[in-house]
């Protein structure tokens, strides 16, 4: 099962990313848990300085923007 973490405070773009990630999981037809991470210390541990950030299975996939659900689906499928 994949673990997807959405990094950032409770902002509009963070919510958009969380929804896009959930849609991507459904679209990809995979098992994944989408987690919201708001703790600044934890976010810095990933080296993310611009939010929202997206981490898939411990690897930073995106920072400072909201990738589309299609992009996230591709990343989840390994494309």
Model-derived regions, located:
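Structural micro-motif
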Residues: 47-55
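Thiol-based oxidoreductase modules, predominantly thioredoxin-like and allied folds used
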Residues: 30-40
């Amino acid at each position: 099962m994949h673990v997807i973490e959405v990094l950032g405070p409770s902002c509009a773009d963070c919510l958009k990313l969380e929804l896009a990630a959930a849609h991507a999981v459904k679209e990809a037809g995979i098992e994944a848990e989408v987690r919201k991470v708001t703790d600044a210390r934890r976010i810095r541990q990933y080296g993310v300085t611009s939010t929202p950030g997206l981490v898939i299975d411990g690897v930073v996939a995106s920072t400072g923007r909201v990738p589309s659900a299609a992009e996230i689906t591709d990343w989840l499928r390994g494309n």
